[in-house]
Amino acid sequence: MLAYKNGLQVFCETLKKKSLDPDTTPIQKLTEVHFAKFIEHLSVYAPTTEQLYLQAVKGFYLFADAEESIRVSQSRLKVLMKQRSRRPGTRIPQSPSEDIETLLEKIRDVENLITSVDDAEKANGIKLRAYRDRAFMLTLADTGFRVHEACKLRRGDMNWKEGYAIIIGKGNKEAVVRFTVRSMHAIKEYLSIRATLDGNSGKQLSALPIFARHDKGAGKKIKPMTPTTGRNIVEERVEQFLGKELVGKITPHTFRHYFVTSILRGTGNLRYAQELARHENIETTKRYTHLTNEELNKAYYEVFEKDSKWRTK
């Protein structure tokens, strides 16, 4: 609210400079021209601040129009904002690839995820969670699943022979998601040790979730994981294998960034990455085409330093 209040104050100051003092001038004198002048005035502000202030003043124009105090063309306001204002810079998605690869290496041996306890029932729950967590994280890394998509995945969605699943993804659209051999193998191992629970569920296997809850609330029932559970799994295993400082920096969505970046580095093909990540807009995929400092250093060395006579021996 403070940002909107500040935006309106700056607008009033701009009007005064244009000899249109809000305290003494009838509101009927206000036109889209003054909005355009305000956009020009905001060029000295940061793009993010500019957008906040423009939204505030645009809202005021629309309110005045609704109250029939002035006549405003909404389409004209939109055109002015689009043509003359600046957009805030887009942050490059951060993909800590090395950290994720370290994590994936650590969980390759499922025994690393299992802690020993004397109680047989607790030990079975720990084992189930270990196999599930490994399969879940490998699936995120190798498929580009959004966390809610992975949680909704059912056994009947899978084509085990061909290594893919057919899902209803973002925008309620049907999509094919491909699996690696390692992620498929991890899922099969997890489902194998879960077989008794699945068989006693009283439901058709095809209707059961791939990734199930294994907590007190679920008991021996097969209930699908929630996105919150998915995020908790990643947090727990990141802390276990990488340390507390990376908790929150590596999330289920970070695995999706890793997936897209891996495709681009492996193929250099933007269209492949877009299709496999199921991005509607290729501009989203383009955000992942940045190079790391290591890659730039290597390219620079190859061009300028590799055969240089000036290089120290």
Where are these regions (language model features)?
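Conserved catalytic core of the tyrosine transesterase superfamily
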Residues: 1-313
